[in-house]
């Protein structure tokens, strides 16, 4: 094997892109923070799915599972977008824990209405972070990442809506 081939194989993972080095670094950083938040939100949503209890068990259990599936589904898209623009992704649980902004909930019991409120708040925080990342992508003219983020914002807004409506208290007749 010649020397050039050996050197290329040792080179850092840097997918060719027309984005500048600063744009690639900043967008990859923003996406990795989002990826950490998405993993944290996924695990919290799944935890609440496993531990929900009470008269609305079935409805909340199913909703949390659907939302967790939707959240997990974007992890690969986020990570692959980082790679497409020449960055590297989070590598470990420890790396995720250092980057995540969505707090964990290690409580043994959480009231179902508190679960709804906490997940709603976490999804709203995710939306804020997504909008900030979108602004960065707009500044750097990364329309592909911005386009993906728009879909993720819409999905998170839908989750917030469902969590909000599930927590509303109707009158005694159910209306």
Report each predicted region and the residues it spans.
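Helix-loop segments that flank and shape redox-cofactor active sites
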Residues: 18-26, 41-66, 132-144
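Short, contiguous alpha-helical
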Residues: 73, 147-173
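Long, contiguous binding/interaction regions
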Residues: 52, 57, 69, 93-97, ...
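Conserved alpha-helical segments that form or flank metal/cofactor-binding pockets of metalloenzymes
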Residues: 52, 56-95
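Generic structural signal for well-ordered, non-transmembrane alpha-helical segments
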Residues: 32, 36-39, 65, 69-76, ...
């Amino acid at each position: 094997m010649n020397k050039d081939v050996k050197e290329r194989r040792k080179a850092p993972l840097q997918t060719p892109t027309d984005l500048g080095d600063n744009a690639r670094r900043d967008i990859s950083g923003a996406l990795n923070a989002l990826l950490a938040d998405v993993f944290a939100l996924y695990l919290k949503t799944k935890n609440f799915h496993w531990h929900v209890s009470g008269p609305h068990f079935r409805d909340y259990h199913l909703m949390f599972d659907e939302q967790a599936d939707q959240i997990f589904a974007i992890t690969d898209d986020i990570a692959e977008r980082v790679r497409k623009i020449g960055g590297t992704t989070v590598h470990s649980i420890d790396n995720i824990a250092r980057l995540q902004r969505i707090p964990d909930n290690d409580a043994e019991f959480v009231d179902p209405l508190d679960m709804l409120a906490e997940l709603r708040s976490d999804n709203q925080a995710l939306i804020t972070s997504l909008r900030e990342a979108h602004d960065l992508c707009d500044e750097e003219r990364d329309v592909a990442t911005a386009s993906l983020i728009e879909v993720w914002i819409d999905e998170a807004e839908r989750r917030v809506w469902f969590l909000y409506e599930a927590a509303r208290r109707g009158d005694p007749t159910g209306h």
